[in-house]
A protein has these predicted regions:
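A residue-level marker of the well-folded mature domains of exported/periplasmic proteins
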Residues: 1-268
Length: 268
């Protein structure tokens, strides 16, 4: 909040914010807007402030890819656990929506679900343990991100279930990519963060120059809207990619996100 106040004081043209708790920034963002400063919500939305742009990875699609991957990995259906991220993170809501939508007509049943406050990975371990108390007849675990998945896999390992239970998550962390080629994680969603950052930078400059961002320039135009709770605001989303052992080399290694040596470090 103090950083945004400083930028307001310095009369910035554009402020890009990445809120951990969007609701907490309501007053200061409204103040920036009242001073004629353009506000871009990056990666996460600040609700009800009528920002000038929301740019993020398509979070609903992230959830859809997770659901589709579990359906593919568990063709006979069965019980699954859903371990979501922080309940104050609006992206979690979108991911959950896409995930549940993807599972709607499947034969997979969410028999246990929980949220991890502040994205604390230890809470994921606790949730998987609680899920296993409900039933150890589980075919898949959806985790809000790869960090949560690391703890889920640890608990599955302790119960001799690692590699037998499909685990899906997001972020394409190095450790997750290693788990995928080693067989203890099924899929991670890769989010092209460099594309997100460069697009946000370009749109920030265009907003600052008073240009119309709905007009295409360098292949980028903003023509969608997202409801922030009170307002439909300009929305630009980046398409995520499901990464499995099959396309790891093509997406992650050839794309320069991680090196082959690092990803296959533990694979003989």
């Amino acid at each position: 909040i103090s950083q945004i106040e400083y930028f307001i004081q310095k009369k910035m043209d554009v402020i890009v914010i990445i809120p951990i708790d969007g609701d907490a920034l309501y007053d200061v963002v409204k103040e920036a807007k009242s001073k004629g400063i353009y506000v871009i919500c990056y990666d996460r939305i600040t609700p009800n402030v009528n920002a000038d742009l929301y740019i993020t990875i398509d979070n609903e699609m992230v959830g859809t890819l997770m659901g589709e991957s579990l359906i593919k990995a568990c063709p006979d259906g069965g019980n699954i656990f859903a371990i979501y991220g922080s309940p104050t993170d609006k992206n979690v809501e979108e991911v959950e929506k896409g995930f549940k939508e993807a599972l709607k007509d499947s034969n997979l049943d969410i028999v246990y679900s929980g949220y991890c406050d502040n994205w604390l990975a230890e809470l994921a371990a606790a949730h998987v343990n609680k899920g296993l108390e409900v039933t150890d007849d589980v075919v898949g675990v959806m985790c809000g991100n790869d960090d949560l998945a690391s703890q889920a896999v640890k608990v599955l390992s302790e119960n001799r279930l690692a590699g037998q239970v499909a685990v899906v998550a997001q972020d394409a962390d190095l450790a997750a990519c290693q788990r995928i080629v080693e067989g203890t994680q099924t899929m991670t969603v890769y989010k092209p963060i460099e594309q997100e950052a460069s697009t946000a930078a370009e749109l920030a400059v265009r907003l600052g120059n008073g240009e119309d961002i709905s007009k295409e320039e360098n292949g980028i135009s903003v023509n969608e809207t997202f409801n922030d709770g009170s307002n439909d605001i300009p929305y630009y989303k980046i398409t995520p990619v499901a990464v499995t052992a099959e396309n790891m080399d093509e997406v992650i290694i050839d794309g320069g996100f991680h090196t082959r040596e690092d990803v296959y470090l533990n694979v003989k």
